Amino acid sequence: MSESDPNHEIVVARLMRQLHGFAQGLGLDRETTRGIVDRVIADMPLAPDDDRLARARNWMLIASA
């Protein structure tokens, strides 16, 4: 799924909404979280959201260290 794909923004919004509290708890800003979400979607275009969320949370933990 490319960033020019209209579904990309829908998926980004959905994942960002679900990761908002986790990101805040780690002290990550919106731009950092968005970059992680974009990367997860690019790396896992056909994966279900649960798998994407797990990967994003792992990367967010690393980014906050």
List the predicted regions and their residue ranges:
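Short, aromatic/basic-enriched loop-to-helix "N-cap" motif that marks the start
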Residues: 35, 47-62
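Conserved RNAP core-binding helix
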Residues: 30-47
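A short, charge-rich alpha-helical start-of-domain segment used by transcription regulators
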Residues: 1-21, 45, 49-50
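Hydrophobic-face residues of short alpha-helical interaction/recognition segments
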Residues: 19, 23, 56, 60-65
